[in-house]
A protein has these predicted regions:
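A short acidic, glycine-rich active-site loop
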Residues: 1, 108-123
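Terminal substrate-recognition subdomain of acyl/acetyltransferases
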Residues: 1-46
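Beta-strand-turn-beta hairpins that frame and shape the catalytic cleft
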Residues: 44-53, 188-194
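Active-site beta-strand/loop signature of hydrolases that rely on acidic residues for catalysis
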Residues: 53, 72, 77-107, 129, ...
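N-terminal phosphate-binding loop and adjacent alpha-helix
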Residues: 57-79
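Surface-exposed, active-site-proximal loop segments in enzymatic domains
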Residues: 98-113, 150-155
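A short, hydrophobic beta-strand-centered structural micro-motif
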Residues: 116-144
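Active-site catalytic loop in hydrolytic enzyme cores
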Residues: 127, 143-194
Length: 194
């Protein structure tokens, strides 16, 4: 009956029912494939055909603490996450108002002061990327490495990974006033959105 109704023999199973003497414990697994059934597609490992980007228009204003800036960052991340954005893109030197927290009149020292917050911003924004399920492009921040200052932006993936890109083409102002050095390579990053 089953074979005449398009059931297919999938496999023979040994010791399926050991107490059945007539079959010697064997069973036949049959499968009927419904041609009208479409299985639900997996949301994992799917190539996206559209990507939603959220560009943050950041108002430069006075901030009195890193926490205050991070609170504003989280406001935008939360809003863009509600819109199901794949990426939140922050502007270059979005944390620059924190240079006002130092009494340094020397611009080189002020940018080095600002670089002291970069790791905290990177870590906090990486946690937000995971919490809000959105990839965050941090906008550039100063980074000190081997006593040199670089202008670096981070890609905080929603799975917790963090990639970085150093600005290659430094503006004359950055080079002259902040003594920022340029990076020497372009990175290409794989994300869950392409």
């Amino acid at each position: 009956f089953q074979l005449s109704n398009d059931f297919q023999v999938t496999r023979l199973m040994h010791k399926y029912l050991p107490e059945d003497q007539k079959s010697l414990g064997y069973a036949t697994l049959l499968e009927w494939r419904n041609i009208l059934y479409t299985p639900p597609s997996s949301v994992l490992n799917v190539k996206k055909t559209q990507v939603r980007m959220g560009a943050v228009q950041w108002q430069m204003r006075e901030f009195t603490s890193v926490e205050e800036v991070l609170k504003q960052v989280e406001y935008f991340v939360d809003a863009l996450s509600d819109y199901k954005s794949d990426f939140a893109l922050f502007p270059e030197f979005f944390n620059a108002p924190l240079m006002g927290l130092t009494d340094q009149m020397d611009q080189t020292r002020a940018i080095r002061f600002l670089a002291g917050f970069t790791e905290q911003f990177r870590n906090e924004m990486s946690e937000m990327a995971v919490s809000y399920n959105i990839n965050i492009i941090t906008g550039s921040m100063p980074l000190i490495e081997d006593d040199r200052v670089y202008n670096v932006s981070y890609l905080c993936h929603r799975d917790g990974r963090v990639d970085e890109q150093r600005k290659v083409h430094i503006t004359p102002h950055e080079r002259r006033d902040w003594v920022i050095e340029g990076g020497d390579k372009f990175q290409v990053f794989d994300t869950d959105a392409g």
